[in-house]
Regions:
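N-terminal membrane-targeting hydrophobic helices
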Residues: 1-163
Length: 163
């Protein structure tokens, strides 16, 4: 579950935004954050409201600080991607909370309701991860160190060139 959300979330974000200033580590963190509540069922982090509130706070706190904002936007982007990659909209009472329902429906979170499909998704996540490792040149120690230190991918890879 975690590999699927973290890796595919980062790759999808890169494919859409291709931003050199975005912290892709925060995208991965945002994408796996809702999994932390999964043992107790789908709760607040599986709602559309959670990433929207995080986005609002980031927009307010980073007013006038464009680069700081761009870096931190990875967190709500990852949280939104979790909802997409999880199919969270199919649990409408939770997804639209508190609009459709004032309480969370008891039961398992989407991550635990798939059974073996969760393993299949993680294997797919590993395959995407191998592709991304090569595509972003993370076998190069300098590029890998930069990614681990700053969360940024090498500019030549982000803008479509091969370094």
């Amino acid at each position: 579950m975690i590999i699927w959300f973290a890796v595919v979330g980062v790759v999808l974000t890169w494919a859409v935004f291709q931003s050199p200033a975005l912290d892709y580590r925060l995208v991965a963190l945002g994408a796996v954050l809702p999994v932390t509540e999964s043992p107790w069922g789908a709760g607040f982090l599986h709602t559309l409201l959670a990433p929207t509130l995080v986005l609002l706070v980031i927009m307010l706190v980073t007013t006038g600080r464009r680069l700081v904002r761009r870096r931190w936007l990875g967190l709500p982007i990852g949280m939104y991607l979790h909802l997409v990659l999880d199919g969270a909209w199919m649990w409408t009472e939770t997804f639209w909370w508190p609009v459709l329902d004032r309480s969370f429906t008891p039961g398992s979170a989407p991550e635990f309701s798939r059974g073996w499909w969760s393993l299949v998704l993680d294997v797919a996540g590993v395959a995407v991860g191998v592709w991304a490792w090569r595509r972003f040149g993370l076998d190069d120690p300098e590029r890998r160190s930069r990614f681990l230190r700053t969360g940024q991918l090498d500019r030549t890879f982000v803008t479509g060139g091969r370094g």
